[in-house]
Curated annotation (Swiss-Prot):
EC numbers on record: 2.7.6.1
Biochemical pathway: Metabolic intermediate biosynthesis; 5-phospho-alpha-D-ribose 1-diphosphate biosynthesis; 5-phospho-alpha-D-ribose 1-diphosphate from D-ribose 5-phosphate (route I): step 1/1
Job of this protein: Involved in the biosynthesis of the central metabolite phospho-alpha-D-ribosyl-1-pyrophosphate (PRPP) via the transfer of pyrophosphoryl group from ATP to 1-hydroxyl of ribose-5-phosphate (Rib-5-P).
Keywords noted in UniProt: ATP-binding, Cytoplasm, Kinase, Magnesium, Metal-binding, Nucleotide biosynthesis, Nucleotide-binding, Transferase
Example GO biological process: ribonucleoside monophosphate biosynthetic process
Statement: the UniProt record of this protein carries the keyword Glycoprotein: no
Record field: catalytic activity: D-ribose 5-phosphate + ATP = 5-phospho-alpha-D-ribose 1-diphosphate + AMP + H(+)
Binding, ATP: 37-39, 96-97
Active-site annotation: 195
Protein name: Ribose-phosphate pyrophosphokinase
Chain residues that bind Mg(2+) 1: 131
Broadest EC class assigned to this enzyme: transferase
Amino acid sequence: MPDIKLFAGNATPELAKRISERLYISLGDATVARFSDGEIQVQINENVRGADVFIIQSTCAPTNDNLMELVVMVDALRRASAGRITAVIPYFGYARQDRRVRSARVPITAKVVADLLSIVGIDRVLTCDLHAEQIQGFFDVPVDNVFGSPVLIHDILKKSDLKNPIVVSPDIGGVVRARAVAKLLNDTDMAIIDKRRPRANVAQVMHIIGDVADRDCILVDDMIDTGGTLCKAAEALKERGAKRVFAYATHAVFSGAAAKNLASDAIDEVVVTDTIPLSEEMKAIGKVRVLTLSSMLAEAIRRISNEESISAMFN
């Protein structure tokens, strides 16, 4: 194995530690702190000349701080003559700002972030479950977008008490993801929630396509933000006779009123991964369980360093 160096910012320290343990490689010695005026201070405290460097840093909230930490760390490592720098971004912030809506005067911020990282000197990106896969094309360097679904599916398969399960897509846009999960769950049935607003200023209506009566519903998505839509979807499923509702998602964004929404009796359990650290408030509601992607990301790092196939991990 080439001379791999692992470094981490302050966004996901526990995930970075788990990845380093699985690779049997200690995290690199770096100072990532703040000056008295709040500016980011980075210093690499060991030799990285010619090394294959991986920086582990989600750009989750506080998004701008974590993004700038990553940018400054890349610059510090580039100036220290690192041989190759891979940005390992388990959760890629700003991914939902991937296009202009019709003629709206808005930026495509995902492209701005990609340009920023490319200009500062990254050689490759490793990320997980991009909200929009076309973001890979925003970069001028290779991007490996791995999937958290195998870890989620493995957990679902371990649920021995599931009764007549059905996979549910929370919207039309998530049908491809839900279909893939359903296929891997022994070709189980699938339902779709079609959200419609009949007319302006009228509450959104949830139409459920599929029979969920007396079944355990498994809602799958790439991320959960405020949880408002998820809560309404769970309520609609329960009204249609669903027995239990389990929500599975890779990224636990959990902003705004997420704790209040996910405490709803309509949702029996929420299962997420550790691409974003769980706050104490979210831990306190008692129904959120966290799975780790450390083994998968560690294997991806090993394969990248050894110039092996990443897609073979998911065949």
